[in-house]
Amino acid sequence: YTNAITLLKDEKNLLPLICSKTYYYLPLEEAPFQTFVENLNFGTTINLISKEEISQIPENSTVIVGFHKDNSTAYKPYKISQNSKDILTELSKKQNVILDVFGSPYALKDIDIASISTILVSYENNDLSMKASAKALLGKTKISGKLPVIVNENLKAGTGIEK
């Protein structure tokens, strides 16, 4: 999983996470996320928040948003709900957002990514990918993955930033 993690954007140089900083984590969609938060907390301070607590985040904070899709079978839908898209749009107006997609990169197909400064694809929502993604965000492992598919005209196969 470590080699697969793909960094698509990091415009504000938010990665790797800084151990002395405090970050906020907002899990969206339906699948488990706890392993990711636990592993991020090994290297920095993470405040887990719910959708209802978004307004309490100080402006210009860094918020990690995880799209946790159930991908236990290929027949599960990869699309992100409109509610999650709306939350992401609102967050990116006042916060520095790191979006991590734990599922198909096609989830990004109809999301406006222009205002999101950092985007990663971790491909699967399981304990191994969550641990690998946390290590990558903390700078403990190199990020070198490339998109294996064409998502849309802006996200083509082979896209990926090494960090």
PLM regions: where:
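Preference for extracellular/luminal or secreted protein segments
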Residues: 1-163
